[in-house]
Amino acid sequence: MASFSEAPPGNPKAGEKIFKTKCAQCHTVDKGAGHKQGPNLNGLFGRQSGTTPGYSYSTANKNMAVIWEENTLYDYLLNPKKYIPGTKMVFPGLKKPQERADLISYLKEATS
């Protein structure tokens, strides 16, 4: 598996489309918005997994204690259930490096 440092440059516009079709049914990025089936992702970068106030995380997600950055998200988004065994996230992942890079590029803009 290639690392984020080897990933292609991300396109935030393409990432927004990916978010809307594959993520938005469970997540939002809007500041102050409530949680959906998954946690609100606003303020994601630099935050420890399992710590968004008001969201009920799996024990596995809380115990993983990963800090969400480009490199950790790149690995996580390949296969969330493999990265955090026991996570409640049902999304199977994004296998294409370009899609992961695009989504991360969008999330960097949309969640800050």
UniProtKB/Swiss-Prot annotation:
Electron carrier protein. The oxidized form of the cytochrome c heme group can accept an electron from the heme group of the cytochrome c1 subunit of cytochrome reductase. Cytochrome c then transfers this electron to the cytochrome oxidase complex, the final protein carrier in the mitochondrial electron-transport chain. It holds the Pfam family Cytochrom_C. The modification N6,N6,N6-trimethyllysine is found at K81, K95. It comes from the Eukaryota. Keywords: Acetylation, Electron transport, Heme, Iron, Metal-binding, Methylation, Mitochondrion, Respiratory chain, Transport. Belongs to the cytochrome c family. It comes from Oryza sativa subsp. japonica (Rice). The modification N-acetylalanine is found at A2. InterPro entries: Cyt_c-like_dom (IPR009056), Cyt_c-like_dom_sf (IPR036909), Cyt_c_1A/1B (IPR002327). It is found in: Mitochondrion intermembrane space. GO terms for cellular component: mitochondrial intermembrane space. Binds 1 heme c group covalently per subunit. Heme c binds at C23, C26, H27, M89. SUPFAM superfamilies: Cytochrome c. Its main location: mitochondrion. The keyword Coiled coil does not apply. This is Cytochrome c. GO terms for molecular function: electron transfer activity; heme binding; metal ion binding. Disulfide bonds: none annotated. PANTHER family: CYTOCHROME C (PTHR11961).
